[in-house]
């Protein structure tokens, strides 16, 4: 599987050995080709209604990629208190991973991420499996930034009225399941991996 910033696209292919290789393409027009004609999540679930629900966790170490293409990638040890190595990604580029899926079935996917201060909008990514967006909603995955009041105490104006505190980003490590941010589906997405 793969994640990507808005614009460039991740493509994944299953190798002959059953491993999943993920790559990122740069042509934004590919986005429309990847999403065009994709089924909705509800239809995707019907398609895989008899699939197994493996009771296992598969961990992909982001810093153990096969290759990176582009700039802005850096492996950082102990970044912001997180043990081990983390992968800092830029806005564009490509990262290739190989993932072994020992048991075919429907899996939830989560990501441990640190939303580095930047734009005020949520982080958006896309997931592709075997080179395709599995369903429409997988093209628009959102990961929240963390906001807090700038000051611990509430300030008041000259009449004693509370003033709305200014919000600032306070990044921290978060684990987030891939889910529908439009609210149509309450449960996290399930993805079929083979």
Place the predicted regions along the sequence by residue.
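Extracytoplasmic
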Residues: 13-194
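C-terminal segment of classical bacterial N-terminal signal peptides
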Residues: 2-9
């Amino acid at each position: 599987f793969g994640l990507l910033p808005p614009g460039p696209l991740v493509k994944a292919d299953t190798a002959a050995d059953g491993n999943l290789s993920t790559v990122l393409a740069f042509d934004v027009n590919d986005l429309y080709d990847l999403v065009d004609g994709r089924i909705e999540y509800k239809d995707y679930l019907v398609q895989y209604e008899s699939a197994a629900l493996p009771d296992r966790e598969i961990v992909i170490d982001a810093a153990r990629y096969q290759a990176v293409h582009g700039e802005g990638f850096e492996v950082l040890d102990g970044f912001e208190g997180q043990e081990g190595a983390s992968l800092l990604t830029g806005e564009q580029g490509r990262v290739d991973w190989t993932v072994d899926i020992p048991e075919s079935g429907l899996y939830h996917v989560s990501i441990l991420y640190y939303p580095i201060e930047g734009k005020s909008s949520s982080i958006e990514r896309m997931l592709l499996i075997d080179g395709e967006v599995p369903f429409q909603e997988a093209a628009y995955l959102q990961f929240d930034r963390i906001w807090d009041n700038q000051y611990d105490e509430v300030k008041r104006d000259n009449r004693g009225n509370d003033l709305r505190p200014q919000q600032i980003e306070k990044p921290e490590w978060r684990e987030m399941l891939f889910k529908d941010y439009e609210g149509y589906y309450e449960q996290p997405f399930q993805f079929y991996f083979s």
